[in-house]
Amino acid sequence: MPVKGSSNNSGSVEDKARRDLRCACKNARASLTADAVMEESACICRYITASAPYRSADRIFCYYPLEGAGEADVLPAAKQALLEGKQIAFPRVTGDHMEFIRVDELQDSFREGSFHVMEPVGSEVLTPSAQALILVPGVAFDSAGGRMGYGGGYYDRYLSAYPETLCMGVALHIQMVTDVMAQPWDIPMQYLATAQGVVHTAVKNDICNDKR
């Protein structure tokens, strides 16, 4: 793995390594069968809804899985949150801006939006409360809480505006890597949810201290 600052072209070498890792992880994820993704996602959702960050949250910020891309499906967790009386919201993108829209039921509440992702059709914008939990998708994660996104920076920009809100990365087993080669602007995850459980990461900052 290239070392930052080890040579004049270290930046370009590292950029290429990140591009290669993103491509490899996306291809590996896309190779999973729909049944395999569904089975692993169901397990992940059970761990999410049993976790302390979820139980203490009043608002759950979810995401709609990319169809056919092998992305972990958190809709079962969103459905459970609604049954428990929690508020839920899903992202909607306009230009470079992402916001979360409240959803009161999962049927007929979405339409295809930016990047062919299903987006909510409602109009009520929700912002993270002090007790909110944001479920964060990604291409790859590492055990230190590092996250590699899709390259657009939408989540990093959004999460940077709410530094005290708990973030839980959601990953299939094939998305866990040794090192995502995080950049200074990449927002780390305080928790990771996988089919092995929900774990607190090694993130060392104020928002990592779960006082609830």
Region locations from a protein language model:
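N-terminal active-site beta-alpha-beta segment that forms phosphate/nucleotide-binding
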Residues: 2-6, 10-112, 116-127
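Conserved phosphate- and dinucleotide-binding cores of soluble alpha/beta proteins
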Residues: 2-6, 96-212
